[in-house]
């Protein structure tokens, strides 16, 4: 997975982005191209990571930041 420059906007490290993606606990399909993943950084802090073309040959993380309240509801879904 590539990490696009916009994913670094909020100061999340590449290592934390990749860790959150590899250990994601929820996937939220935002639209046909964008999937938000909820996963933990290397220190356990929850992150939201936006990935374009997640099922394609060249997925790109374009967003990463600490998990916002609006995504909390997805944590309680099975």
Label every model-predicted segment.
Residues 1-78:
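Ribonuclease/tRNase effector modules and their secretory precursors
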């Amino acid at each position: 997975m590539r990490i696009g420059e916009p994913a670094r906007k909020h100061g999340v490290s590449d290592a934390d982005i990749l860790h959150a993606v590899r250990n994601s606990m929820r996937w939220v399909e935002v639209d046909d191209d964008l999937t938000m993943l909820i996963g933990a950084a290397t220190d356990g802090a929850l992150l939201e990571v936006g990935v374009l073309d997640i099922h394609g040959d060249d997925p790109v993380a374009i967003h990463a930041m600490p998990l916002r309240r609006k995504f909390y509801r997805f944590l309680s879904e099975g």
